[in-house]
Regions:
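Extracytoplasmic
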Residues: 1-190
Length: 190
């Protein structure tokens, strides 16, 4: 595992899609006692980002991603792909927040049913563990300015982010969640 790198990436979507590997963030903010860490080769395509250590609070931590090239759409569907982490705190699921362009954050509880309860074991638990990821989708309004800023905020420790896909109407579901979109490093970021 490695510290979370330099950031500064700005993505350019095409055909109504922006696909972003979690480790290619624009900016990261660590929690007071936990730092963003890149986990190479975790995930289906490149790596993943998680706060370490898992035993510390996540208050104030966030990853931000910048992107353009989605046209004049009013809303987008944001697909967030995380590792299929179990609710090891046994609190009814683990959550993160997603926001776009400074708008209201949407809370996502991605693993509330990822357990061995009889009603979930065959329909949710086994298939999810076999896939090794959980994909959650939220619809968010798009601000007027580009590049756009997408923010992920873990509310619980142990969440491992693998990929983000912004769908402005062109995304076709696929196993690897699309080839990563073109990117550049913002001036003055390296």
């Amino acid at each position: 595992m490695a510290a979370g790198g330099q950031g500064g990436y700005v993505f350019e979507g095409s055909d109504g899609v922006v696909s972003i590997e979690a480790e290619h963030y624009f900016c990261k903010r660590d929690a007071k006692e936990a730092c963003w860490t890149n986990i190479p080769h975790m995930g289906r395509t490149l790596g993943a980002m998680a706060l370490m250590p898992y035993t510390k609070p996540t208050d104030g931590a966030e990853l931000t991603y910048k992107f353009g090239g989605i046209g004049g759409v009013k809303t987008v569907k944001v697909h967030v792909v995380v590792k299929s982490t179990l609710d090891f705190q046994v609190k009814g699921g683990m959550t993160y927040e997603v926001s776009l362009d400074g708008g209201d954050a949407v809370s996502v509880n991605f693993n509330s049913r990822l357990n061995e309860n009889p009603e979930n074991v065959h329909s949710v638990y086994y298939p999810t563990v076999a896939r090794r990821v959980v994909e959650s989708t939220v619809t968010l309004p798009v601000g007027p300015d580009s590049p756009h800023t997408l923010t992920l905020r873990p509310k619980d420790p142990g969440i491992v982010f693998e990929k983000v896909v912004v769908d402005a109407g062109g995304y076709v579901p696929q196993f690897l969640f699309g080839k990563e979109s073109g990117k550049r490093v913002a001036a003055g970021r390296r």
